[in-house]
Amino acid sequence: MRKLTIPFNVFIDTEFTDFLDPQLVSIGLVVQSGEEFYAELPYELRECSEFVKAAVLPLLGYAPHAEMTKDDLYLQMNNWLRLVRPKDQEVFVCYDYQTDWDLFYDVLDGRVPPWCKRRLVADRINELLRYEFHKKNNLPEHHALNDARANCYAFRELPSSSTAVPGG
């Protein structure tokens, strides 16, 4: 009998300067069991789009100890991933937008631990549940940690064909 393993998902979200040349502004990581990581990086205001200036930047600066350099972020995020990872288990880094993965990869300088697997989950995020999460918890969107939390809450695993019951 094969042991059923539940995927260990880490949901990530990022906020960045603009779509043309995205530079990381903040990153949030959330595990379904409740562990969280959040960081904010220095940014150049002139590189930020008008949308980012209006919707993202006003939400920054409220989390104690979140501001750090990119080097510190590399160390702290790597340590956090190692701490939350179940023993000898793969970690699925779940993202709903390609730039989130690209910026995560960039923070790790391309040295993503071999036990971290990327997983695009945009088609598994229930948008109504995501909206409900923000409203119910009175948390604004376009904040990396809030959005990672919302994605974790709204994520629904699609049934796998190997576990489907015929005629059921």
What are these regions (language model features)?
Residues 5-95:
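Conserved non-catalytic scaffold segment of RNase H-like nuclease domains
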Residues 94-97, 133-168:
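Acidic, Mg2+-coordinating catalytic module of metal-dependent nucleases/exonucleases
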Residues 99-118:
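Substrate-recognition/cap helix-loop segment adjacent to the acidic, metal-dependent catalytic center
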